[in-house]
Amino acid sequence: MSQSLADIIAALPDGDGWGPAVTTELTLNGVPYAPFSKGDKLGRMADWTDGKDRDGRGGRQQYNRNFRDQQVYGAGTASLFSAPQAEDESTFSVVSNVRDSTKTRFGRGAVFTRGGRGQRGARGTERGGRAQLSRGRGGQYGGGYDRGGRSAAGGRGGRRFGWKDYDKPARNRDASINVKADWSLLEEIDFNRLGKLNLDADEGEDVDSYGFVHYYDRSYDKPAVKSAERKLNPIDRAAYNVTTSLDPVIQELAEKDEATIFATDNILSTLMCAPRSVYPWDIVIVKQGSKVYFDKRDNAALDMVTVNENAVDAPLEASEGSKDSINQPSALAEEATYINHNFVNQVVIENESQKVDMEHENPFYNAAEETEPPASKAYKYRKFDLSTNDEGPVYLVVRTELDAVQKNSNNGEDQFLTVRALNEFDNKAQGSGGALDWRSKLVSQRGAVVATEMKNNSCKLAKWTVQSILAKADVLKLGFVSRANPKSNDKHVILGVIGWKPKDFANQMNLHLSNGWGIVRTIADMCLKREDGKYVLVKDPNKTILRLYEVPAGGLDEEEDNGDLGQEEDDEE
């Protein structure tokens, strides 16, 4: 039986309206109170702003990601008291203050192995031997570090980095020397510790000087003209790269107790710039009585000039997928070493009547044995004070090199130069590090070209700068040499030469010699407190770590014999 409208109205509760009761029994100091938790979600009872056709067929996770409540009370991701918006809320969003820790898509590189043995450096003789620079076969070179890796599908410029992507070992590389099982690990030093070392040293003083230098040809400072590019010509001159303990001058200075630590500028700069290094290397340290000699092995990685060592996407080896044999690290290092050797010989004016002679003749050149004339090279043996306040004097003697001399345009005085060359292989190839086209940009955008080289070759340029400062050179000349054809590494052209004061260039690179002196003194002290013998300082091939090993008697003889044997095999071929 249907009820009448009057009966329904009569059944309604008494009061002014309908709904929940106005009063509540829960009060706090007379104020109505509703218990709550900050963890409770305060969402909307119903959302009428979205359409009914929601693309949500991804299961529970898809639903929670797309349609969960916008705010958790007390979470701090939005305003504490959210006032209702009078306008449409669909276009409103809150910027998240939570750091995004999502990993990137791309990987970190591949495996790197060393190439075949080749003819590269100075063979060990009684006086050290001279460098035989050959362009034939690829040299054995322990290198190939990629600080970035490659994009699988991004192509050129497609690199992206994730959280702590910089801190991962990029490639599995071979060490520059085989660590034997009977070698004792004495110290392990992280690069972070090396970067905190500091020791102020003096400007140094000249102990003795040998050799001679020719005058620099200033015509190379002029920008090259496209129609008249200067070719890099191979010039055979007798150049030497004698290790420390085989240097007859250093042997005499050691007998006179001139210093405690002895080294060459190449070895010393490698140690002082160790925190910037990426490729593996090793230094042999000989401790005899109260003296320490920093030496290098024959055909060591220190003899080679690296290319784009610090580039984000460094050159790849064949084992890493590189099909460009002339752009692999070992081939590029051999090419760069060849360029530097010939570039220094070409940019000087060989005039016997105008050369600048040092106090003594070249200590390594023997006219009866050599068929080529000696290269323009002056050897200065300089002494530095590495003492601290709470001990006796500790001196270091280093053999430095100067390549040329020029007249100061203002006062006409002689300025000594160190001459080096940067080389461009192919700015569009893998491993170029985003380098600009030197032919079109070197004149108009010189600063950008140099800045890119500072980024891609930070370690190499730092070593050259340190060598110039150690030699007390007035100017560091950097040549820019490019391939005549990017697909061939046989012919090169000189595009220009730029000169800097070494200390100004060091400031641009944020290079501090006090840190380098601290590293040298620390490593020397580690060896001075130990027994006489041989030690090897090894740069880890995959980590930013230096390791100091104690080598038993005869432990390095086998390594040196193997190197000489390989050299003889190459000569026979």
UniProtKB/Swiss-Prot annotation:
GO terms for biological process: cap-dependent translational initiation; formation of cytoplasmic translation initiation complex. Its main location: cytoplasm. Residues 556-573 have a biased composition (Acidic residues). Keywords: Cytoplasm, Initiation factor, Protein biosynthesis, RNA-binding. InterPro entries: eIF3d (IPR007783). Residues 136-156 have a biased composition (Gly residues). It is found in: Cytoplasm. Residues 111-162, 552-573 are annotated as: Disordered. It comes from the Eukaryota. GO terms for molecular function: mRNA cap binding; translation initiation factor activity. Residues 301-315 are annotated as: RNA gate. GO terms for cellular component: cytosol; eukaryotic 43S preinitiation complex; eukaryotic 48S preinitiation complex; eukaryotic translation initiation factor 3 complex, eIF3e; eukaryotic translation initiation factor 3 complex, eIF3m. The keyword Cytoplasm applies. The keyword RNA-binding applies. Component of the eukaryotic translation initiation factor 3 (eIF-3) complex. Belongs to the eIF-3 subunit D family. mRNA cap-binding component of the eukaryotic translation initiation factor 3 (eIF-3) complex, which is involved in protein synthesis of a specialized repertoire of mRNAs and, together with other initiation factors, stimulates binding of mRNA and methionyl-tRNAi to the 40S ribosome. The eIF-3 complex specifically targets and initiates translation of a subset of mRNAs involved in cell proliferation. In the eIF-3 complex, eif3d specifically recognizes and binds the 7-methylguanosine cap of a subset of mRNAs. The RNA gate region regulates mRNA cap recognition to prevent promiscuous mRNA-binding before assembly of eif3d into the full eukaryotic translation initiation factor 3 (eIF-3) complex. This is Eukaryotic translation initiation factor 3 subunit D.
